[in-house]
Every structure is written in structure tokens, then in C-alpha cells.
Amino acid sequence: MPARGIRKAPDRSKRDAGRDPLRRVPVIAVDANGADLGPAEVADGATFAAQQGVRVLLFGPAAELGNAGPAIEVIDAPISIAKHANPAASARAHPEASIVRAALAVANGEADALVSGGSTGAALAASLFNIKRDRGILRPALAAMVPVPGAPVTLVDVGANTEVRAEHLVQFAFMGAALAQVVHGLPRPRVALLSVGEEASRGTQIVLDVHERLSAASELNFVGNIEGHALTEGRADVVVTDGFTGNVALKIMEGVSKKMIELLRETANSTKRAQVGGVLMKPALLAVRDEIHPEVAGGAYLLGLRKIGVLGHGRFKARGFEQAILLAARAVNGDVVGCTHDALERAGALRKARTVSESGSTVSAS
């Protein structure tokens, strides 16, 4: 099969203006399998990211990944477990799978971070079995940046743990706060607990227990409970919840945002007068679309491991995978793993290593 051509990178000078340059050259292991648009789209994203100073180890079917540039090394790994029903069993049974080999490269020190746009369950399983949890971490967690214009909100967990205990959510709060400090430069991010009411007495027993523990944590800027409608109102910088609730909330917001853009487009073309107004409003509407588009966020951080991971959306195009790789690179340069561990250690929220089993985390496919 002839090698495919790589698309020319678009001009991103305006979009990337003001972003912090990558301080060193991190190496990112990227799983090219599992994306809805195929490995070629991931390869294009890797090419765009490499042009911004990142080295990439690209794991996938070499025949579909094209001619790699000087900063990209293609590792032929055509086997995918992204669609397998049991991610944990598949990750153990298929060590040659692309996601497993990418995670192993991170564990062995060949790469600094992992990026995948395939199955969440497969990426979690491969990461837990190879990269492993950081010392004292009970459960890894997925932290997504909710694309609120001008003020991204870190939502954690968004799918790694469908069932949790109070101590898990306490650790998630500290991990999310450390991430917000590094990524957004917030010296003391406001942390809130997602619940069915703002009062301290509202919520499940787990939420009540977590509220009490976070209120007593002087190291944390805990601002209390927050309801779902307030996620985008700027009341908190970090919102903590279990993976089931967080995943549902995130996907509802993504769906509503997408539908609103579609309705605006349809309305702007509905009449001659609307078309004139649409032309005048087009620059502003495009700016809003770009601000809230999931691809701009770049995916979710996988926190609590010995190395950082970023899980992109399977529907991402090249632009989204580029952002996912750049997210991972900036997390490496910002030492998110070290900052998270230090924050938990200072707060006394780490468990002794002997009390943490390697198989204690819930792995859920999505």
C-alpha cells in the first residue's frame, strides 16, 4: 500500500498567539489506533504538533501513517483493542496492541507521556498495567477542561471511576487543584464539589463525607457545593465528582454546545434578513465556536499515574489530536505529576504504598 501524504499544516499563528512555548523537547507516545477517522488523522495531528517542538513516537499501522518527519518515529503496531468488550483482559492478552506498546514506551522511559484517542477503557487498562499509579494514589482520574469562554473549568473525574469512595474524591480534589495551578497558573484554585444543592447538607452520603473532609483541608481552597447549572458560571476553577456523573455532565455540555452552533447556523440562513445579520455576526460566532469546541480543549488528562496521560475524543480531527499532544507536552514541562504528588503529600492525603493494590482501580470502557 503506498504511503499516504501528510496534509500541509494550517497557519495557526493567530490561534496560538500568547501560548507558552514548550520549554524543552518532550517525547510523547501516541496511539494512532481507535480514532473514528482512522490512524491517518492522528498522524496529521502528530505532524502538526511536531512542527511546534514535540517529538512523537507514533504507534499504529505503518502503512497508514505516511511519511514521518524528522521529529516523528513510526512504530508499526497495527493491532487495536479499542473496540474490545473487556479492556482489562484485552490489554493483558494483547501485549502487541498499539495502546499497550505506547504505554510500555512511557513506562520504560522512552517517552514522557501517553496520548490516545481510542477506547478510554483500553487506555486506562494499558496505563495501569504498565505505567502504574503513582505512590500513594488510590485511583487514577480523568480531568477535562470544560471549554468555558475565558475561564476553563477543570472537571474531575469524567470517566475513569464510575464508583468511588469518599477518600477517592478527596484525592481527586487535590489532583485537580494541582493541575489547575500548573496549567492555568492559578496560585489557589477554587475547588467545588458537584451536588444537587449548594447547601452542605445536600447530596449522597459520600458527597456529605467528602464535603466535611474538604472543608477541613486548609491546604485546599474549598468553596463548597456547586450545582450542575453553575459549572459554566465561573464560581469554581475545579469541580469534583465521580466518573459516572462527570462523564454524563461533560457529554451533555458537549451535545448542547454542538446543537446550539447548529441552530445558530440554521437560523442565520433561514431568511434574507437573517442572512445579512449572519454575515455581520459571523466573526463573533466563529470565535465562540472555536472557544467552546472540544478539539480546542484537546482531551482529558489522566492523573494519578507515574507519568502523565492525555485521552482525546475518538471523533477528533487532526486539530484535536495536535492539541492533545501539546497538552501532554505542556504537562510534562510543568511537572504535573510531581506537583500533584507534592500537593497530596503536604495535605497528608496519600496512602502508604503497601495499602494500595495494583488492581484496585475501576476500569470502564467508553
Language model feature labels by segment:
Residues 28-40, 91, 160-170, 311-318:
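Short, glycine-rich nucleotide/cofactor-binding loops
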Residues 70-111:
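Phosphate/nucleotide-donor binding subsite
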Residues 128-155, 235-239, 243-360, 366:
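Glycine-rich phosphate/nucleotide-binding loop
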Residues 112, 118-168, 172, 178:
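Glycine/threonine-rich beta-strand-loop-alpha-helix active-site module
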Residues 40-41, 53, 57-63, 67, ...:
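Glycine-rich phosphate/diphosphate-binding loop of Rossmann-like nucleotide-binding domains
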Residues 2-64:
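N-terminal phosphate-binding or glycine-rich loops at protein starts, especially the Walker A/P-loop
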Residues 31, 59-60, 75, 116-118, ...:
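Short beta-strand segments
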